[in-house]
Amino acid sequence: MKGKIIPIMCGVDRSGMMNVKDMAEEHHMLLTGTTGSGKSSLIRGILTSLILHKSPDEIQFLLGDLKFSEFGIYKRLPHVMGVYMDAQSLLPQLQMVAKEMERRGKLLDKMDVESIYELENPPPTIVVCIDEVILLKDKPKIMKIIESISCIGRSNGAYLMLSMQRGDAKSLGGQLKNNLTFRISGKQLDETNAKISGLKQSVDLDTAGRMILSTQGKERVIQVPYMDKKKAKGLLDPFKTKQKSETIKIEDEDKKANEFSLVEVFEDEPKG
């Protein structure tokens, strides 16, 4: 986890090695998989681990919970700009992210650097995480901003983490899909959906938590960490504030035998 700007604990591969990737290097992220594939647990584990290992001055999250089911445990955390349940409330927050990217772009030009991480005091990384982004496909204003983040967000410290159960041929625009180069997919129902996810091997997966990781064009089978809501809530509660306004901060189930717990990983990590 050390030395990485946005460390993503993906899972253990067949050699027994834990794959920890830096999203700042791997670019924007797409997670896919059918119900029961382990996708929700993986997202929960990724968000929780980043909150535990990074300060609010280092990373901020904008969360879209379009199924009303996944991100409630992240409310009132100093790392979280807000949790938004529908397109109407999400749009103005994404518009503010777009304005912040523009501000940061001007700052980079003024300072003659290519990335915010080259600045002496960089602003926090912004991670826009939207569960079931497919529900926004008919919202052109939102999708335009999401695509813009995918194109220019990296140098400005803004990243996408998008999830959906499965795709169809028109679910994501070509430009956006091409920019989601960091991919993890659980079980897909058929070869068509596996192909659209970009990971053809995902149709052959038959175990909960078994997924295909693709980075820099290379695929490998991994077993992703297990993190249920109760455990995540217990880890996060000490960080919560009594009250938190949901406005964006802008500067000026039982474990199965083949699953492993992120709690064990966190307990072994040095604090600080």
Where are these regions (language model features)?
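N-terminal, intrinsically disordered, polar/charged segments of Gram-positive cell-envelope systems
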Residues: S245-F266
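Short, glycine/acidic-rich hinge or "gate" loops at secondary-structure transitions
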Residues: D109-E118
